[in-house]
């Protein structure tokens, strides 16, 4: 290819297995007409072999160590896709380094499949537009329900959480049925009231726990949209809820371990329920502990995190 002007290389994360973790980003040339759109955090379509893949611009560079004659140009920038925040790239980079995986092997599988599929040449409308239209927040059975009063032990735990500012890990230890969920909900209610655009993340270990909790949360917070993230959702529904979370339209996000890698730009608090549960450990593909990643995310974002359990793990205790 012809000489490329300085600053016109994109280092792109792609979901492909790699032999060497240090070589986890791939260099592509940026054509002048894409120079403004192809910024860090943007979504791009790139040539890969004889096909095309969706990738994420993780870095911009003035030069490349690859022979420029071998560097292929970006095929397109998906301009209706949300630009992902630097905080998310920081978390993904930690995960990739700590668990010895390629950056793209962590970043791309965390995104719903529908959104990381290259658009068909003659597609009518984008996957992002369809997903935005699809989002319907979790419905409440009894919208605006009155929270039950807390007992003394619950109130004491809540007071500790309410006093938390900045990063801190708080273990809520109580037997099953002791009312830990009520403490979470009272706390998150205060966080949402205090943070005008803040978002809260509530992780649960099993998919089966999400419907009832989502209904309960929606009833408690009728003014806020609730997004639900887990692997059993249909592709279009997962994409719709993920986009609502990423774009801040959903201020409450409930999910299983995959939600730990959701790029929430306005994260204000995290809850990990049943933090001891082995289901938080991803065993396929890029392996990680969602509980541990949630703690890292809270540290990086300087927000409080509550871990709840009747039988806490040794690490948390």
Segments predicted by a language model, with ranges:
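Accessory, non-ATPase domains that flank or precede helicase/AAA+ motor cores in DNA-metabolism machines
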Residues: 1-317
């Amino acid at each position: 290819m012809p000489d490329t002007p300085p600053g016109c290389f994109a280092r792109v994360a792609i979901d492909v297995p790699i032999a060497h973790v240090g070589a986890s980003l791939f260099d592509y040339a940026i054509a002048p007409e894409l120079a403004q759109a192809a910024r860090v955090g943007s979504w791009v379509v790139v040539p890969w072999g004889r096909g095309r893949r969706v990738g994420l611009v993780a870095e911009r560079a003035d030069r490349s160590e690859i022979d420029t004659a071998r560097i292929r140009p970006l095929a397109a920038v998906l301009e209706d896709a949300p630009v992902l925040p630097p905080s998310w790239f920081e978390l993904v980079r930690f995960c990739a380094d700590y668990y010895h995986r390629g950056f793209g092997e962590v970043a791309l599988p965390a995104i719903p499949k529908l959104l990381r599929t290259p658009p068909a040449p003659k597609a009518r409308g984008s996957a992002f537009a369809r997903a935005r239209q699809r989002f319907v927040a979790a419905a409440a059975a009894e919208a605006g329900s009155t929270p039950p009063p807390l007992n003394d032990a619950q109130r004491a735990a809540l007071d500790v959480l309410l006093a938390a500012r900045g990063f801190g890990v708080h273990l809520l230890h109580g037997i099953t049925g002791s009312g830990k969920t009520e403490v979470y909900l009272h706390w998150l209610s205060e966080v949402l009231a205090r943070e005008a655009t803040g978002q809260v993340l509530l992780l649960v270990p099993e998919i089966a726990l999400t419907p009832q909790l989502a209904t309960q949360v929606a009833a408690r917070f009728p003014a806020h949209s609730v997004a639900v993230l887990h692997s059993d959702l249909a592709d279009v529904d997962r994409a719709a809820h993920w986009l609502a979370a990423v774009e801040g339209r959903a201020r409450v996000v409930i999910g299983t371990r995959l939600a730990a890698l959701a790029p929430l730009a306005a994260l204000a608090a995290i809850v990990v329920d049943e933090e001891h549960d082995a289901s938080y450990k991803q065993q396929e593909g890029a392996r990680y502990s969602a509980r541990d990643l949630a703690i890292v995310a809270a540290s990086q974002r300087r927000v409080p995190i509550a871990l709840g359990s009747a039988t806490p793990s040794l690490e948390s205790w």
